[in-house]
Curated annotation (Swiss-Prot):
InterPro entries tied to this protein: Aldolase_TIM, CBS_dom, CBS_dom_sf, GMP_reductase, GUAB1, IMP_DH, IMP_DH_GMPRt
Organism: Mycobacterium tuberculosis (strain ATCC 25618 / H37Rv)
Protein name per the record: GMP reductase
Residues of the active site: 303 (thioimidate intermediate)
The organism's taxonomic lineage, starting at the top: Bacteria, Bacillati, Actinomycetota, Actinomycetes, Mycobacteriales
Other remarks in the entry: Was identified as a high-confidence drug target.
One Gene Ontology cellular component annotation held by this UniProt entry: plasma membrane
Xref: Gene3D superfamilies: Aldolase class I
Keywords: CBS domain, NADP, Oxidoreductase, Purine salvage, Repeat
Oligomeric and partner information: Homooctamer composed of two tetramers.
Binding note for cofactor: Activity is highest with Rb(+), followed by K(+), NH4(+) and Cs(+).
Biological or metabolic pathway of the protein: Purine metabolism; IMP biosynthesis via salvage pathway
């Protein structure tokens, strides 16, 4: 199991910034020889779970992340009918092709500009009676009257291919194409999807997270109030693949009762629950019937719990202790919160997490549900907010009477409005997944691990000063 460099854990708790991994002798020759799949029942083939945050987890995010091997957990405040629609949408998506934004020929340039950035590939497909007739790029819309019809500006010189064409062939066809996106059609000529050159490469690297029927996987969260069992059953009937019982303070009797109620239904789905930061909390949740425990109180970017209450724990130490306790009972943990760099993912996995939950980092992507906005310097951003914030509480308590709703809104513990800028080099969630998995694969080669279990077994972790952490930062502007 993971050990500390000097053989002894320090007498104080640690964050991800406080620690580093020491390289070991390795026989792993290539990053592509590393298996990133997990064994916690979630079905992920990369250790990435998207947090159940309204500003992050929607159907575009769910489709895209599952295609690359992760899974999205839909937020608990999403109504059951909306969950059903989202699950049906995601499970009907192609395992290779992206679902494009579509426009009718008479839609306006203004309509196109509002929709193009819903997807990272940067185009919208103009369709007539289900068949593609052109592509619209952002550059096509610049300097054009916003009421112009898209049929008048659509690009008609683009690569087409039948659905089922090998991604490598699509890659080759796009080498000298004027638009870096191929449009694929079914036998009757109707639109099947699109694929970019980068998407074609990714199709050969990632394995989609799929259910027993070969469809993309998706999860959903439920809170601990009301008839939790009925809500969980409704989510299972909607077709979700993973259930998450979610509350800020998971180590309470109400959470344990909710876990027992859902576990007793025997729905045949993996059950995650949280959040906790101690071995005792982990054991209690697993004994109540959870298969996976979510670990983290206060490390998230949108969370103010520690500053409001003084409650929480540095995340690396919390993950390390809880993972050890879970392993003794045959359970697993997800490291939830505090992830800002690929190294943090690697450290959480080295400490024993089976998956890492990411929220705010993914809010600043094309695939997150929010609208793309621009600041005064024309830099793109999206809004994010915490799930215990006033904004989220108001949305979640919409069915309450006005007095109760106002009373609950007084006790928010999160940021209601935050700007997450889109990285110009990594604007899509797939770009961030590439960034993360590349880092974790490299970690494994440095450690001599061919899979995540071996990473945890072989990792040697040291403790560093703030200056040590700063030393590891690149200096692109020199010094």
């Amino acid at each position: 199991m993971m050990r500390f460099l000097d053989g002894h854990p320090p007498g104080y708790d640690l964050t991800y910034n406080d620690v580093f991994i020491v390289p070991n002798r390795s026989e792993v020759a290539s990053r592509f020889d590393v298996d990133l799949s997990t064994a916690d029942g979630s079905g992920t083939t990369i250790p990435v779970v998207v947090a159940n945050m309204t500003a992050v987890a929607g159907r575009r995010m769910a489709e895209t992340v599952a295609r690359r091997g992760g899974i999205v957990i839909l937020p608990q405040d999403l109504p059951i009918p909306a969950v059903k629609q989202t699950v049906a949408f995601v499970k009907s998506r192609d395992l290779v092709l992206d679902t494009p934004v579509t426009l009718a020929p008479d839609d306006s340039v203004s309509d196109a500009m509002a929709l193009i950035h819903k997807r990272a590939h940067g185009v919208a497909v103009v369709i007539l009676e289900g068949r593609p007739i052109g592509l619209v790029r952002e550059s096509s819309c610049l300097g054009v009257d916003r009421f112009t019809r898209v049929r008048d500006i659509a690009v008609t010189d683009y690569v087409t291919a039948p659905a089922g064409t090998e991604p490598r062939k699509i890659f080759d066809l796009l080498e000298h194409a004027p638009v870096d996106v191929a449009v694929l059609t079914d036998a009757d000529g109707t639109l099947a999807g699109v694929l970019s050159r980068t998407g074609a490469i990714r199709a050969g690297i990632y394995t989609p997270a799929t259910d027993s029927a070969g469809r993309l996987r998706i999860g959903a969260a439920v809170g601990i109030n009301g008839d939790v069992g009925a809500k969980a059953r409704a989510l299972a009937e909607a077709g979700v693949d993973v259930l998450v019982i979610d509350t800020a303070h998971g180590h309470q009797v109400k959470t344990l009762d909710a876990i027992k109620a859902v576990s007793a239904l025997d729905l045949g789905l993996p059950l995650a629950a949280g959040n906790v930061v101690s071995a005792e909390g982990t054991r209690d949740l697993l004994k109540a019937g959870a298969n996976v425990v979510k670990v983290g109180v206060g490390p998230g970017a949108m969370c103010t719990t520690r500053m409001m209450t003084g409650v929480g724990r540095p995340q690396f130490s919390a993950v390390l202790e809880c993972a050890s306790a879970a392993r003794q009972l045959g359970g697993h943990i997800w490291a939830d919160g505090g992830i800002r760099h690929p190294r943090d993912v690697a450290l959480a996995l080295a400490a024993g997490a089976s998956n890492v939950m990411i929220g705010s980092w993914f809010a600043g992507t094309y695939e997150s549900p929010g609208d793309l906005m621009r600041d005064r310097d024309d830099q793109p951003y999206k809004e994010s907010y915490g799930m215990a914030s006033k904004r989220a509480v108001v949305a979640r308590t919409g069915a309450d009477n006005p007095f109760d709703r106002a009373r609950k809104a007084l006790f928010e513990e999160g940021i209601s409005t935050s700007r997450m800028g889109l990285d110009p080099d990594r604007g899509g969630v797939e770009d961030l997944i590439d960034h993360i998995t590349s880092g974790v694969r490299s970690t494994c080669t440095y450690v001599g691990a061919s899979n995540l279990a071996e990473l945890h077994e072989r990792a040697v972790v040291g403790v560093q000063s703030g200056a040590g952490f700063a030393e590891g930062h690149p200096l692109p502007a020199g010094w």
